[in-house]
Amino acid sequence: YNDFIMSKSQKETIQINSGDITLEALLETPTHSTRPPCVLMCHPNPRQGGSIYNNVLDSSSSSLIKKGIASLRFNFRGVGASTGIFGDGDFEGSDALTVIDFASRIDQIDGGRLGILGYSFGAGIALEAASVTSKVKSMVSIACPQRRFSTFGTAEIVQPKLLICGDRDHDFPSGHFKFLSGRFTKPRQVEIVNGADHFFSGYEKLLGDLVGKFFQETL
């Protein structure tokens, strides 16, 4: 029964203005918490069907709710009900910063305790956002594309970070992922999920548990 209570949440679709673009977002808040911390979520590449409705984001959000943490997923420009044209990474970083700014002012969450999570293409955007704003207190990168991941890792991301990759990711040999992860400043946690490929099918609960525990400890 207690598990049932702890997993209850309220979902609300909201629109966020980003310049002349309107972004569609989904705010999910735990009903058992007052002004909880919140994790922003960046989705995979829409050219491969990515949006806020995704197995990795779903499992992460469910796990966070059980920990008393809200989530705010948003569709990048040109995706779902978000207006504009998808920018292939050129404008999505600024969309993320707009959403972070918006989240810091939402009454029902604690705007001083914001985290960010990104999956695949979205992980690159989350890393970019975390490198330029102190409003994000911790961040999670899941299956960031190798080429994008390799552009980070110097001192620019000072927040606690959890870096995750499957050992069967078609894009990223786990040995190279481990090597590149070592270039990130501490505090950092590196997790290679044995048996998981880029899509984490069948590994959602394990992933959600990693994400929930990390944000519970860092927000």
Feature map (PLM): residue ranges:
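Serine-hydrolase catalytic machinery in alpha/beta-hydrolase-like enzymes
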Residues: 16-109
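Short beta-strand/loop motif that positions the catalytic acidic residue
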Residues: 157-158, 163-165, 169
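Post-His helix in hydrolase/transferase enzymes
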Residues: 201-214
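Acidic catalytic loop of the alpha/beta-hydrolase fold
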Residues: 167-172, 198-199
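A domain-start/cap signature at the N-terminus of enzymes
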Residues: 3-15
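Primarily recognizes the serine-hydrolase "nucleophile elbow" in alpha/beta-hydrolase
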Residues: 96-159
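Short alpha-helix in the alpha/beta-hydrolase fold that links the catalytic acid
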Residues: 172-181
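Catalytic histidine neighborhood in serine/cysteine hydrolases
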Residues: 183-199
